[in-house]
UniProtKB/Swiss-Prot annotation:
Topology relative to the membrane: Multi-pass membrane protein
Xref: InterPro entries: AA/rel_permease1 (IPR002293), APC_superfamily (IPR050367)
GO molecular-function terms, A-Z: transmembrane transporter activity
Pfam family, one: AA_permease_2
Official protein name in the record: Uncharacterized protein MG225
The keyword Transmembrane is annotated on this UniProt entry: yes
Organismal lineage: Bacteria, Bacillati, Mycoplasmatota, Mycoplasmoidales, Mycoplasmoidaceae
Family listed: To M.genitalium MG226.
Transmembrane segments: 14-34, 36-56, 100-120, 127-147, 158-178, 203-223, 241-261, 286-306, 344-364, 380-400, 419-439, 449-469
Length: 489
């Protein structure tokens, strides 16, 4: 192997990680917390705790192989027995699930932007104008996805520019929220009182808690992508970077939640003048159309930068699977320009199908409730991400069982083992109730629950079929070689 070109210093990568994780995921899902009233703090702290546990697991596993790309898929290959089909299948699905997180998260960005503009007078409540907005927004994102298949890249100055716009908009949202609180009075008492106000009359089910947990977890997602970049960092302590970045993100979110919790009528849907169902409503409430457009354009401007590279980046996740013969070699064939065009078009196709279903079906089923549809889209991608974390917990338990030298101090090992067990239990419980909400005995089965299971099931089935076809080809090749050897002898 040639010498690795490490692109980031420790400080640069720390800033990169914080910028990568913290952002529009937070403002897209933060309002969902307050649908639980005073329990919003409990869920915020629980999500943060599980995110910390996940960060600790990735930080621990990052020492397994800091010289090669791959992240969870690379760790899975080292943890299981490749000679057994169960081991190969686990390795494959660890990599495949990491790939399908992309398509399952594809609808969040367009719905988030559509939601930002849906509050403009003349759109909300007008079916024709609503469909025009949806058509324009959806077509725009399809175009961005198509452009990204051409290998469009952004230089460091443009990335810094887009990041600056993102933080200007996010910090503006918090500043505007403080202004609205100062002008209209704070809602801390209203939002945190179990016996009075909006929440005193609400019945909160376990399914609602699980849905909010998974939706808000979207704001912490990203460590699974960061973990594959260990060879790019000039550091001997990748673990410290991940933990410090988590602390920075947590503190920012904590301050943001404190501010948003002071808004009156937060997490109230319906489009009334005094209701706040999303962050765009805060801007609209502050100064009307002008600030709303500022927010929408700023959010769109930042979003374009990420979408221009999303197809290319996600297509890279299936290349190791193809190189290891878990997927057809068709995927890693390059064109004359050196691009993996087949993998890119496959990623584009799966992304387009998932995005179409996750945009239109939730909107129509909810009677064009953009807040609900956006939070649902975020929860679908987040659920797939949480499943990936279960795979990672299994991998680290496997390494511990094999007595790999992951720990130097026994008390650290014992503490982290207990935390990993806790994280696994919480995630499994939340996923079960989210996917099958009727478990709690109060919630009803809805169209979106069927869509979640069917879409994830179909994408997983596609992977399983491709995997089994490769297994069949490999077995036939082995038998043919065996027969040739016997004939020669």
């Amino acid at each position: 192997m040639g010498q690795i070109n490490r692109k980031f210093s420790e400080k640069q990568f720390l800033l990169f990680v914080v910028n990568y994780i913290a952002g529009f995921g937070f403002i897209a899902t933060a309002i969902s917390l307050f649908r639980l009233g005073p329990f919003s703090w409990l869920i915020f702290l629980l999500v943060s705790l599980v995110s910390l546990i996940v960060t600790l697991s990735f930080a621990r596993l990052s020492s397994i192989d800091s010289q090669n790309y791959g992240g969870p898929y690379l760790w899975a290959k080292k943890a299981v027995d490749k000679e057994k089909i169960a081991g190969r299948m686990f390795s494959f699905f660890t990599g495949w699930n990491n790939f399908i997180i992309g398509p399952l998260s594809a609808a969040t960005a367009p719905l988030f932007i559509l939601n930002s503009f849906s509050g403009i007078d003349g759109i909300r409540g007008n079916l024709v104008n609503t469909w025009i907005l949806i058509a324009i927004g959806f077509s725009f994102y399809v175009l961005l996805a198509f452009i990204s298949t051409k290998g469009t890249s952004l230089n460091k100055k443009l990335i810094a520019l887009f990041a600056s716009v993102k933080w200007i908009v996010i910090l503006s949202a918090l500043i505007v929220a403080i202004y609205v609180i100062a002008r209209d009075g704070n809602g801390y008492s209203q939002n945190n009182n179990l016996e009075s106000g909006f929440f005193g009359r609400r019945e909160i089910s376990f399914a609602q808690i699980a849905t909010v947990f998974i939706t808000f977890f979207y704001s912490y997602a990203g460590v699974e992508d960061i973990s594959v970049m260990t060879p790019d960092v000039k550091t001997n302590n990748f673990r410290k970077i991940l933990i410090v970045s988590f602390i920075a993100v947590f503190l920012f979110y904590f301050i943001g939640i404190i501010i948003l919790n002071g808004l009156q009528n937060i997490a109230q849907r319906g489009g009334e003048a005094n209701s706040i169902g999303n962050v765009a409503d805060i801007f609209k409430k502050a100064a009307g159309l002008g600030t709303l457009i500022f927010y929408g354009v700023g959010a769109l401007f930042n979003n374009v930068s990420t979408r221009l590279s999303t197809i290319i980046a996600n297509s890279r996740k299936i290349l190791p699977l193809a190189y290891d013969n878990y997927l057809p070699s068709f995927f890693y064939k390059q064109n004359k320009k050196g691009e993996f065009q087949n993998a890119i078009w496959f990623t584009f196709g799966t992304t387009l199908i998932a995005m179409t279903l996750l945009v239109f079906i939730p909107l129509v089923a909810s009677n064009f409730d953009f807040d609900n549809a956006t939070e649902y889209a975020a929860s679908v991608g987040s659920a797939a991400t949480l499943l990936q974390y279960i795979f990672v917990f299994f991998i680290i338990f496997k390494f511990i069982y094999k007595k790999e030298p992951l720990y130097q101090k026994k008390w650290v090992k014992t503490t982290e083992e207990l935390l990993f067990c806790l994280g696994t239990i919480v995630i499994v419980l939340m996923l079960l109730v989210y996917l099958f909400p009727v478990i709690d005995g109060f919630s009803k089965w809805e169209t979106k629950h069927t869509l979640t299971i069917v879409l994830y099931g179909v994408l997983s089935l596609i992977g399983l079929v491709l995997f089994l076809l490769q297994e069949y080809k490999h077995k036939n090749k082995q038998n043919a070689n065996k027969q040739t050897t016997q004939t020669t002898v």
